[in-house]
């Protein structure tokens, strides 16, 4: 999980999701997981 100031979709399978007020990226590729800190 990468924690970044600006999250973005890396591939076309990445999905932006808002959970508990944080923006997350979930993807089938675990390297693409991100969270906005």
UniProtKB/Swiss-Prot annotation:
Q: Name one GO cellular component term.
A: ribosome
Where is the protein situated, by its record's location annotation? Answer: Plastid
Q: Which InterPro entries match?
A: Ribosomal_bL36 (IPR000473), Ribosomal_bL36_sp (IPR035977)
Where does this chain mainly localize? plastid
What highest taxon heads this organism's lineage?
A: Eukaryota
Which molecular function GO terms apply here?
structural constituent of ribosome
Keyword annotations from UniProtKB, A to Z: Plastid, Ribonucleoprotein, Ribosomal protein
Pfam families on file: Ribosomal_L36 (PF00444)
Cite a single GO BP annotation: translation
Which family, according to the similarity comment? Belongs to the bacterial ribosomal protein bL36 family.
- Record's protein name: Large ribosomal subunit protein bL36c
Origin species, per record, is Cuscuta reflexa
